[in-house]
Amino acid sequence: MAETSVRNFNINFGPQHPAAHGVLRLVLELDGEVVDRVDPHIGLLHRGTEKLIEAKTYLQAVPYLDRLDYCAPMNQEHAFALAAERLLGIEVPKRGQLIRVLYCEIGRIMSHILNVTTQAMDVGALTPPLWGFVEREKLMVFYERASGSRMHAAYFRPGGVHQDLPRQLVEDIGKWIDPFLKSIDDLDRLLTGNRIFKQRNVDIGIVSLADAWAWGFSGVMVRGSGAAWDLRKSQPYECYSEMDFDIPIGKNGDCYDRYLVRMEEMRQSARIMRQCVDLLLGKESTGPVSNLDGKVVPPKRAAMKRSMEALIHHFKLYTEGYRVPAGEVYAAVEAPKGEFGVYLVSDGTNKPYRCKLRAPGFAHLQAMDFLCRGHLLADVTAVLGSLDIVFGEVDR
């Protein structure tokens, strides 16, 4: 009698799955309940961002970057603004730098609190997301009070930030910090020592440091494996070199360590925010928030009422844009998900010749097969939750 060959069982995970974080589709090959192979299918949210930017002026390109990692929009704008500023050879005034750093850290907390709480939800804890969204809502309001929009802010522009922050807003951000740290401690007590949470995350999805570098990981994925690599310290931009903060690192490189790193990073972000708030209310309470070059930054409304030149500058800036000297530059920021880079090529015209976006989630997703092989089916969601993937930036 001929023996029947046993073949593996294939299932589709997503793109409608609640734990798939957007439009992810994984084709899983299972041997019983053990994962043999993971094949991620991407491109379901592809919008051609890089190509669209080539048809827009440098100022009009900014809103596209909000729509990449939409959990922390301003961090993406930051990389693009830095790249354009390096090509233009302009500096951002100190107050503008502080506002940028403040809002980048707000974005980091927004992203991490969403990730940590939904990671807990993926493994069965329903309370954390409800707590996390309470704090996240307050941060969304700070976004709205600065830029007028809760998510797609378009607030960081090449040359600085769009508008100054009212003093009351800076004071309110300062008042928010201590209650937030208390709620992080509550979350910590709920999850960190929780037996079920630990059983689902400890020793799952282990990445050694050598593997992390080889796969092109960055951000929490590298720090969870024990490397204190953070662009805010290793390649400081804006005024991060003047800020006092620590880089948390993990020991084992598993899902649990990555969770712990994110929890501590939120506390460090709050620490940076407090320093920014103190400076913005004290030494740097007045001054310009963007470069004073009228060719790059629009004039104030009052100046437009008085001066014909200001009106012309404003009109030219929003219709034609400014010409950027020919050249190429790579600017990277430590976004919440990892190293977000913008490689900008200018041919001397008012539009970018090429804008390559280096999304951290892309490198992390490609390792799903490597991370999940040999684990059980239920561990796929735990690994995916700890990678912190957002499809806006993966598919671009």
Swiss-Prot record:
The record's listing under InterPro entries reads:
NADH_Q_OxRdtase_suD (IPR001135), NADH_UbQ_OxRdtase_49kDa_CS (IPR014029), NDH1_su_D/H (IPR022885), NiFe-Hase_large (IPR029014)
Q: What class of enzyme is it?
A: translocase
User: Pfam families annotated for this entry?
Assistant: Complex1_49kDa
EC annotation?
Answer: 7.1.1.-
Q: Member of which family? A: Belongs to the complex I 49 kDa subunit family.
Gene Ontology CC terms, in alphabetical order: plasma membrane
- Main location class: membrane
Which subcellular locations apply to this protein?
A: Cell inner membrane
Membrane topology label? Peripheral membrane protein
- The entry's protein name is NADH-quinone oxidoreductase subunit D
UniProt superkingdom: Bacteria
Looking up NCBIfam families in the UniProt record yields: NuoD, PRK06075.1
What catalytic activity does the UniProt entry give for this protein? a quinone + NADH + 5 H(+)(in) = a quinol + NAD(+) + 4 H(+)(out)
What gene name does this entry carry? Answer: nuoD
Keyword NAD set for record: yes
Keyword list (alphabetical) reads:
Cell inner membrane, Cell membrane, Membrane, NAD, Quinone, Translocase, Transport, Ubiquinone
Q: Which organism is it from?
A: Mesorhizobium japonicum (strain LMG 29417 / CECT 9101 / MAFF 303099) (Mesorhizobium loti (strain MAFF 303099))
The record's GO molecular-function terms, alphabetically, read: NAD binding; NADH:ubiquinone reductase (non-electrogenic) activity; quinone binding
What does UniProt list as this organism's lineage?
Answer: Bacteria, Pseudomonadati, Pseudomonadota, Alphaproteobacteria, Hyphomicrobiales
Listed under subunit, the entry gives: NDH-1 is composed of 14 different subunits. Subunits NuoB, C, D, E, F, and G constitute the peripheral sector of the complex.
Q: Does the keyword Cell inner membrane apply?
A: yes
Q: What does this protein do?
A: NDH-1 shuttles electrons from NADH, via FMN and iron-sulfur (Fe-S) centers, to quinones in the respiratory chain. The immediate electron acceptor for the enzyme in this species is believed to be ubiquinone. Couples the redox reaction to proton translocation (for every two electrons transferred, four hydrogen ions are translocated across the cytoplasmic membrane), and thus conserves the redox energy in a proton gradient.
Q: By its UniProt entry, which Gene3D superfamilies does this protein fall under?
A: Cytochrome-c3 Hydrogenase, chain B
